[in-house]
């Protein structure tokens, strides 16, 4: 699946077009992915619907991915734009493309986590979870 923007940027789910080194470098500096190894990153991409935002020349300028069963639940994560290109609407284009991806288009519950981009996601219907204390997490390192 591929979406195009007025200035010829595209978002694609073609994993063959991912510039893994660029994505890994960006995510290595992202607060939510610190310490994630190359192997873990590769497996996470392999086992999700990965979306790449590409410049008109085909250079990777953004990335995101869906983790979902395709029926009941979806988790949008690792949404990131090349730091040199932020503020140009590419994040908005990526999220718009992601929420319309056919793999999750009919999924009733789609979640994400953000520390600082609430206004971006609110444009597409995401809201703050009303009862966050109902959510729990399991971290492998804390249960060995």
Task: Go through each PLM region and give its residues.
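Short amphipathic alpha-helix that is part of the acyltransferase structural core
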Residues: 1-36, 54
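Short alpha-helical
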Residues: 18, 71, 116-119
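A conserved beta-strand-loop-helix scaffold within acyl/acetyltransferase catalytic domains
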Residues: 39-80
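Conserved acetyl-CoA pyrophosphate-binding loop and the N-cap/start of the following alpha-helix
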Residues: 85-94
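Short helix-loop capping/hinge motifs at secondary-structure junctions, enriched
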Residues: 142-144
């Amino acid at each position: 699946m591929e979406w195009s923007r007025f200035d010829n940027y595209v978002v694609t789910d073609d994993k063959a077009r991912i510039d893994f080194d660029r994505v890994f470098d960006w995510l290595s500096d992202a607060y939510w992915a610190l310490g994630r190894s190359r192997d873990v990153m590769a497996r996470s991409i392999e086992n999700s619907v990965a979306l790449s935002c590409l410049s008109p020349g085909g250079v990777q300028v953004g990335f995101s991915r869906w983790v979902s069963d395709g029926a009941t639940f979806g988790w949008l994560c690792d949404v990131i734009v090349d730091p040199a290109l932020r503020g140009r609407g590419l994040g908005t284009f990526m999220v718009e493309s992601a929420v319309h991806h056919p793999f999750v288009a009919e999924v009733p519950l789609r979640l994400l986590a953000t520390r600082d981009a609430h206004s971006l996601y609110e444009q597409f219907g995401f809201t703050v979870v009303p009862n966050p204390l109902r959510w729990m997490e399991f971290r492998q390192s804390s249960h060995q």
